[in-house]
Amino acid sequence: MMRCQIVSSSRAGRAPRAVFLWLASLVALGWLFVGGAAAQGGGELRFCLRSEPKTFDPLKVEDDASESIRYLTGGVLVRMNRQTQALEPGLAQSWEVSKDGRGIAFKLRSGIAFSDGTPFSAEDVAYTVQQLMDPALHSPTGDSFRSGPGNVETKIISPTQISITFPAAVAGLDRLFDQVAIVSAHSPKKEMAVLGPFVVADYKAGASVLLKRNPNYWKSDAQGRKLPYLDSIELDIQANRDVEMLRFKRGEIDLINSLDSEYFDKLAATSPQQVRDAGPSLDSEQMWFNEVAKAPIPAYKRAWFRSQNFRRAISEAINRDDLSRVVYHGHAQPAVGPVSPANKFWFNGKLKAEPYSPDAALKTLQADGFRLDSGVLKDRDGNAVVFSIITNAGNKSREQMAVMIQEDLQKIGVQVNVVTLDFPSLIARMTQTFDYEAILLGLTNVDLDPNGEMNLWLSSSDNHQWNPEQKTPETPWEAEIDKLMRAQASSADAAKRKEAFDRVQEIVYEQAPFIFLINKNALSAVSPAVHGAHPVILHPQTFWNAEQLTAGK
């Protein structure tokens, strides 16, 4: 999520693009292990992905593992510097946004080739945009550009010049291209031909992804040395945090991109120089109920989950202060809503974290006919309130939170069954079979700007997790959010955008489709073997400058 002014000139400082990714571990936030031998360069950076990447197609990315690979391999027209939060030239050496906010013209660098040697030109940009905006592709990245109905027009002026015109104004248009990895229009390797610093060299399902230095990468450092410095990056697929920490301590991996607070404190006690706390992050942990009409759950339970009073009551009955204190050892704060207070411009300061009150929760439930019967909460038809919460196995923080939520809700007569699943099984239930009642996961905010959240809040989106891909909004409040999100996305007036997105946050607070729990600090661990790492709060926190990292013994 990102804040700041809306910029229309090529090098204007710009807020990062806020795209919410459901982390594989969705909660886990990807990892990267970086190594470094600063002077000599070379070496291998070793790190872990906390789940299997769902795709290598950069236009279809919606999970954290795939996003990490896209970031490391994809070449973009403009890149948001994760440290300064300013836009910097990428494959485009300059660009200009039209005054009406509908168009953008790029001047591309010449003499660049994809990793397989295929020349890069404006044709590839046009092809990428056409694919990105194709409704049949269902690109989560493309959702950020959908501010109005109609087709996108691309005009190739020369091999190094292209203009793109959208049917309606798109706020922060230049910034959004930070997430658009350009794909080749002609390479037989399709999306596996890349323009970023690394290329996928090997993939062993369930085990690892090996990235190697892209020999055709166009960047050099200030001394004229070709980037990246690293020869390779080995990404091990490892969901178990205990194993990950053990491997870090043994020196088998170089970096932990998102460190649990328990591990942070333990490592800080013995090796304080290896831990980094960048402060409050943009990411959140939350739970939600399944409201999908075709989900294989009893109708009476779906009625509970679709009730605003039920969702609000569950939220009121959860002790967020305890979650922050016990689970995160003080390295977290109770969440207010979809925007972290660390996102200073876009955060709605009028909202306050839900106060813990079992009494208020019971009162709210009574409005829907729920009642306590010998310590058991029942609905008006006599059905005992029982549901399961699923979360990803191996994530100790989530597992502990689920148990604490179970204990909190027991105080109002609700029986919660906690179920842990491997991440692929969880994702399948969440996105394919809809065979679940409630889910506890995390949300990663890639940018500060609400435009990056279009794929989360639009009712038609497949990332609208509680009830995705609605043909038309099924509730008045979702219709209002659709309208507000499109309005802010098509406005060049920062004050009007802020007003619209403040209202979105208020609706989400009132309706509680997501029950936001905590915002955790950006904690990471970096091996002394890694040189050049400067962790930040924006994704990818530790390896945002991977092309400049070095790894050594």
Predicted segments with their positions:
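Surface-exposed binding/hinge segments that line
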Residues: 22, 40, 107, 141-187, ...
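A structural "hinge/loop" feature
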Residues: 51-68, 91-93, 118, 141, ...
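Bacterial N-terminal signal peptides
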Residues: 18-32
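Cleaved targeting-peptide boundary
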Residues: 39-45
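Sec/Tat signal peptide C-region and signal peptidase I cleavage site
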Residues: 33-39
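Extracytoplasmic/periplasmic ligand-capture domains
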Residues: 4, 79, 83, 105, ...
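N-terminal secretory signal peptides that target proteins for export/translocation
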Residues: 1-17
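N-terminal lobe/hinge region of extracytoplasmic solute-binding protein
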Residues: 48-99, 130
